[in-house]
Amino acid sequence: MMNTALQKKCACRVVRLAVACAGVIVLTLTACASGPKPLDWQLEAKGAMERSVAAYLEGNARVEAVEFARAKTEVSSTGRVDLMARAELLRCASHVASLVFEPCAGFEKIRQDAPLAERAYADYLGAALQPKDAALLPPQQRLALTGGDAGVKGMSDPLSQLVAVGVAFQSGRASPAMVQLAIDAASSQGWRRPLLAWLGVQASLFDKNGLVEEAARVRRRIVLTQGDLKAPR
């Protein structure tokens, strides 16, 4: 049974622009029954950003691009650099989760005006975070940065896990256990793109260690995951 205070808290409706995945909450808007409803741009941006991230992780780059452009249009109407920075970072986080390492070009265009926390997160995604800036990271990513395998395993959000292992992989710190955690996280959500990427890493690790049968098993799983697709679109 919930106590009265918790019931009152739950009576409020929380609307997020995008998901709280990857440790980045793009925007949180709380609307209680007695308060104003979320504005149209907030709802449109939220929906488009969520669809964009989902499409990318499922392997559909075309839909991702369309939905991300829609989200940016809505966010740009506010003139707020912090919101645009977070939208760009969420997109880049989904790429890092899928082992696509490239400059976060959209964010870099507005870096000089972005808040310090967003700059730190961008550096983190590029495996270039300065130790002094670690405190600026979202709590789950700080945990992963310092906690190793246990830190990643303790993360509650699948995309946060994938991003953390992706950053560790860039830095040469990803253990076989972390790779398995990334595989499990992607598989649990049906995210084809990162699953294929991390299965490829695991197969290479088995090859490197002379584990022929294990490598062959993983490659059969890759074929199964691809289905009728030769590669993510």
Kindly give the residue locations of the regions a language model identified.
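C-terminal motif of bacterial Sec signal peptides marking the signal peptidase cleavage site
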Residues: T28-A31
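N-terminal Sec/ER secretory leader and immediately downstream segment
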Residues: K37-A114
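Residues that mark the junctions of alpha-helical repeat units in TPR/alpha-solenoid scaffolds
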Residues: E44, M84, S175, L195-L196, ...
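Amphipathic alpha-helical segments of tetratricopeptide repeats
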Residues: A69-T73, R111-Q112, I183-S187, S204, ...
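Extended amphipathic alpha-helical interaction segments
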Residues: A117-W191
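A cross-kingdom marker for long, charged
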Residues: G200-R233
